[in-house]
């Protein structure tokens, strides 16, 4: 089973509420080093935490991070972008590009860049933070990018399994961070989510459904489209 004891962890989006919790909890679990990455990485007061500049939308930045962090055993694709409006037709072009590059292409190219590094280790892990919106298309391009990442995570899991790289996908509704500040639905505490994710990693699980919303939405994938989206059923009456 994968273990955080002695692990070298890289966290994207480490300046944010969820990323900061991943940094601290990885160390609590026994990680020997954590690369805390962001476009403008903050200063930490722990010598085990290494600030590292990384823009997940920039291929050159991704390659530079892989070159600088060749000892990584756990890659946590946590960085994400959201949108101000719900529909693909109302998003700005910049919102669409930012979401595609941050939520999908960034984790994808990070996994590709770090795959040789992780494959060379005895125990290694990739954690991809998805969303319950992976399975519920009301978030426009945000939902679309998270669905794409879910599919890519499933593919990478199969491709990397022979090399011993364990790939975990995480689905959750709202988390109490700045990104969800305007949401009025119940929110999960970041520390609780991180604890659940790291428990799942060390238990060898492949997928984390962190809340009831995620459980229900995944179960609904096999239902008729009209059951998931009642507004479509109304049009057929």
Located regions from the model:
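Active-site loop of short-chain dehydrogenase/reductase
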Residues: 71-72, 118-130, 162-166
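Conserved mid-core segment of classical short-chain dehydrogenase/reductases
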Residues: 82-97
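Rossmann-fold cofactor-recognition segment
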Residues: 46-58
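A short, exposed helix-loop element centered on a Lys and neighboring polar residues
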Residues: 111-112, 154
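Active-site helix of classical SDR
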Residues: 111, 145-146
């Amino acid at each position: 089973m994968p273990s955080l004891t002695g692990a070298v962890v890289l966290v994207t989006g480490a300046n944010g509420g969820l990323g900061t919790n991943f940094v601290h909890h990885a160390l609590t679990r026994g990680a020997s080093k954590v690369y805390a990455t962001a476009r403008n990485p903050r200063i930490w007061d722990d010598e085990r935490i290494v600030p590292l500049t990384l823009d997940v939308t920039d291929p050159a930045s991704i390659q530079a991070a892989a070159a600088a962090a060749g000892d990584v055993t756990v890659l946590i694709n946590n960085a994400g972008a959201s949108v101000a409006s719900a529909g693909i037709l109302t998003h700005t072009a910049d919102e669409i590009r930012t979401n595609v590059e941050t939520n999908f292409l960034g984790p994808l190219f990070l996994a590709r860049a770090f795959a040789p590094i992780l494959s060379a280790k005895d125990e290694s892990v990739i954690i991809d933070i998805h969303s319950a919106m992976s399975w519920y298309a009301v978030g426009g391009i945000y939902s679309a990018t998270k669905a794409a990442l879910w599919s890519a995570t499933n593919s990478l899991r199969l491709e990397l399994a022979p090399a011993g790289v364990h790939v975990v996908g995480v689905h959750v509704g709202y988390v109490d961070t700045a990104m969800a500040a305007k949401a009025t639905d119940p929110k999960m505490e970041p520390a609780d989510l991180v604890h659940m994710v790291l428990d799942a990693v060390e238990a060898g699980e492949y997928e984390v459904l962190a809340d009831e919303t995620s459980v229900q939405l995944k179960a609904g994938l096999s239902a008729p489209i009209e059951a998931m989206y009642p507004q479509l059923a109304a049009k057929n009456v």
